[in-house]
Amino acid sequence: MGKYNLILSEYLSFIYNSQSAVQIPIYYSSNSELENRCIEFHSKCLENSKNGLSLRKLFVEYNDVIENATLLSILSYSYDKYNAVERKLVKYAKGKPLEADLTVNELDYENNKITSELFPTAEEYTDSLMDPAILTSLSSNLNAVMFWLEKHENDVAEKLKVYKRRLDLFTIVASTINKYGVPRHNAKYRYEYDVMKDKPYYLVTWANSSIEMLMSVFSHDDYLIAKELIVLSYSNRSTLAKLVSSPMSILVALVDINGTFITNEELELEFSNKYVRAIVPDQTFDELNQMLDNMRKAGLVDIPKMIQDWLVDRSIEKFPLMAKIYSWSFHVGFRKQKMLDAALDQLKTEYTENVDDEMYREYTMLIRDEVVKMLEEPVKHDDHLLRDSELAGLLSMSSASNGESRQLKFGRKTIFSTKKNMHVMDDMANERYTPGIIPPVNVDKPIPLGRRDVPGRRTRIIFILPYEYFIAQHAVVEKMLIYAKHTREYAEFYSQSNQLLSYGDVTRFLSNNTMVLYTDVSQWDSSQHNTQPFRKGIIMGLDILANMTNDAKVLQTLNLYKQTQINLMDSYVQIPDGNVIKKIQYGAVASGEKQTKAANSIANLALIKTVLSRISNKHSFATKIIRVDGDDNYAVLQFNTEVTKQMIQDVSNDVRETYARMNAKVKALVSTVGIEIAKRYIAGGKIFFRAGINLLNNEKRGQSTQWDQAAILYSNYIVNRLRGFETDREFILTKIMQMTSVAITGSLRLFPSERVLTTNSTFKVFDSEDFIIEYGTTDDEVYIQRAFMSLSSQKSGIADEIAASSTFKNYVTRLSEQLLFSKNNIVSRGIALTEKAKLNSYAPISLEKRRAQISALLTMLQKPVTFKSSKITINDILRDIKPFFTVSDAHLPIQYQKFMPTLPDNVQYIIQCIGSRTYQIEDDGSKSAISRLISKYSVYKPSIEELYKVISLHENEIQLYLISLGIPKIDADTYVGSKIYSQDKYRILESYVYNLLSINYGCYQLFDFNSPDLEKLIRIPFKGKIPAVTFILHLYAKLEVINYAIKNGSWISLFCNYPKSEMIKLWKKMWNITSLRSPYTNANFFQD
């Protein structure tokens, strides 16, 4: 078996190293004789350990089990009490503990004072400013590090250096923690007042971040960066990350481009050997030096020196070190401020009347015109989505908080909950549901707030608006997004593009007569100056649209939307400050509306257009591209002459002066070669991504289980690794062991094996080999997958009770009746299931399901139930295919230049051989004709799973399905009778399989699966006309070839001789594939 089980066994010996500790391995096998031996072996182990006898003899006697069966889990007994961590820590606590400088941060509570100084009493205490919000503890993290250190103390050569670097850093952490004692966590992994009162308030979150950093140290540079960040982040909890990452916005403008990739007309990346010189005016260097000065003032030494040294050559070869610093800066942890400070931050800006009204007018008009442009087609044609906007809103209502807790009755059960979906049901049951009235958010009913914490920036507040706002905005925003989807300017929404496409767009026009202007407008989005012109622009647009239709329902939709904007122009928020709730008039735009992303993009586009129209009075240029992406916008400007330092200087100053005339506090920069925005940065013609996902601290607590969080941890590790920040894999695996272990009693714990955690079942957490998704096809793998499928979905009494109540049933019936024109069980059941699934965000239900899940799991990990599930998974399909393939060696030359320097070598190699892809493969069925037909007449959006089910029904059933959703009979008949229907069968199957194989996640999203170079390694003689079978054979072959190359750095070619007789069997099977949800797929989804 793999490395994981080996480490697991070593880890258990490390943790439970006393006389009383016992490890009992549990094996299973799909072979019934061997399975009986496994059972005997297990019971004898239990027997022996109860009588205090050694297990060694049994290991010899049952060697056949150990050799041939598969490890299922390890049961560990230990009567050891808790102080193990403290004892082990002393060995490493040989250094000088850190002393926090208590004057570094502006806000008193951001200084790392002793907790009782910040919070004199337990009543005042809150952990919300330092809560790691992750279901693992500091003691576990310390154990994981000490385990690694002990395991590697005898390393030699280069590995010894890594050991020494990490040991040195851990000494700092250990000594500091040891001075105060290891804070003990409670059952919910929180740190309470009596634990923290005599310790520095930020000790835990700092230690977690430091451990994450030190376990990511490999080179000497890593060591220097980590040491500096660990030491300084102990005191500076507010500005460190910002200080360290600020220079990047200028660094990208300093590197010459010598060959780059550009987007061609086919939207593919194509190499261009152009040379573009970085033209940098002196003022830019002055600004950079100012930044480096600020870093030194904050006590940084090595990091500014590295940047200074790099500035000598400004080479792209050494640039990855700059990228590394930029990524590392985020790993100091989240900045979590008090809500009051977060809210006041936006209101502190001086409001001046001294602004350029003319520019504001232009800005407002551009917003107005864009809103009209986005919506005029659907409004003129009385689009059904705008007519049935309320129903569409209800169908996609979230189960997030509605801002207040209410007592709700479901049948005999009384519950109190804050969830939007439950409030809607309750209001309908009690005749309180009035979507036609948008509740005010003024001083009488101020808006409750949520928060968004992010490293290196201030905490931002989020409006938690009543559900009426969501219903009023949903349909209109969906229409805006559809427009944005085919408008290149909206980089974030543009049709199935990914970031590589946007990269090629920027480099496309760079030359010696162009410059690129890039602006971070996040300050502007939340400024008071923005709110009036912004909302007024939208309102004016809606007024114009209202004159384009006579349909009462469309008018009502537009009117309600307008009302949300009017209400929000007079908004108050409520902020708890100690025991009082403060009401503050809040005159700025905050996220929390459905329109946040779309409307911000519109506004930011309007903003950059306004600025460009102003500076075009002074300079003559052609605007080659304008893009907006979230909080950032950028534009490439082409001049008639070659760009000079003076020109850049002038344009730069004019742009800044122009923003200043609108009193917009934004950071605007001009360069000839690169840009830096929140999502990505381009330097030297190459693309970089910030690898800044925190592993051991989380932004907030949700209702995910420890297993979910272990999968998320692994997923975060993978994303960071693809972006150039690598954490030691053994450490990550150790964390997974800790987080997936299940306590049976105080002294008894069960640790699942690698097989359990990596087989794609409902319990999958990680991949045995990074970047490679394996679908087990051996007997034992399929056996365990089947066993897990037997206990997949857990019931919840509370959920069943709610679902049985009339309140719930009537709600579902009401939705079905409004949606359907005739009976349609598939849709009705689908709605009921979706609504029931939304109940999972109600804590008591998720807790109940979790308990059931764990008890089922416990049974399973001790002895797998023999259960012959008749369900077919993707594994079964691949298992049928596998035997017909023969492998031979092959060779592919490297033929593409590198353009993403931070990628791991094995992934980079594949892109260099077969090329990259700039699009997302469609995996939701939305491009199929049936999906388009439905959306033409109905607001209902079937999932890919549902489409997959429907498209394989009999033709008359498909007709009935369509007619019940309001599709005219003639259209339904035409559809079923046409070629399009058979194309759809294939297309939907294709989407479904892509979806099951996670083709848009991990590193697979980077590879060009249609590469001719890849195709030529695969030979499948064409037999019979079953395109679906040909498709799955090709896809399987491609994945096999790519996985082999990732693992071995060399290529194979595959030949498949698939018998005709088997094809039809396989085709039939392909219509019954069950999809599996697991913590792993859930974590992929969580990455977006």
Curated annotation (Swiss-Prot):
Compartment(s): Virion
GO BP terms: namely: DNA-templated transcription; viral genome replication
The keyword Magnesium is assigned to this record: yes
Record's Pfam families? RdRP_4, Rotavirus_VP1
Q: What Gene3D superfamilies does this protein's entry cite?
A: 1.10.357.80, 1.20.120.1390, 3.30.230.140, 3.30.70.2480, Viral RNA-directed RNA polymerase, 4-helical domain
Q: What keywords were assigned to this record?
A: Magnesium, Nucleotide-binding, Nucleotidyltransferase, RNA-binding, RNA-directed RNA polymerase, Transferase, Viral RNA replication, Virion
Q: Which residues form the RdRp catalytic domain?
A: 501-687
Q: Give this protein's Gene Ontology molecular function annotations.
A: nucleotide binding; RNA binding; RNA-directed RNA polymerase activity
**What InterPro entries does its record include?**
DNA/RNA_pol_sf, RNA-dir_pol_4-hel_dom, RNA-dir_pol_luteovirus, RNA-dir_pol_reovirus, Rotavirus_VP1_C
The EC code for this enzyme is: 2.7.7.48
- Reply yes or no: does the keyword RNA-binding apply: yes
A cellular component annotation (GO) from this entry: virion component
Q: Which cofactor does it need?
A: Mg(2+)
Catalytic reaction annotation: RNA(n) + a ribonucleoside 5'-triphosphate = RNA(n+1) + diphosphate
Its biological function? RNA-directed RNA polymerase that is involved in both transcription and genome replication. Together with VP3 capping enzyme, forms an enzyme complex positioned near the channels situated at each of the five-fold vertices of the core. Following infection, the outermost layer of the virus is lost, leaving a double-layered particle (DLP) made up of the core and VP6 shell. VP1 then catalyzes the transcription of fully conservative plus-strand genomic RNAs that are extruded through the DLP's channels into the cytoplasm where they function as mRNAs for translation of viral proteins.
Query: What is known about its subunit structure?
Result: Interacts with VP3 (Potential). Interacts with VP2; this interaction activates VP1. Interacts with NSP5; this interaction is probably necessary for the formation of functional virus factories. Interacts with NSP2; this interaction is weak.
Q: Which family does it belong to?
A: Belongs to the reoviridae RNA-directed RNA polymerase family.
Indicate what this protein is called per its UniProt record.
Answer: RNA-directed RNA polymerase
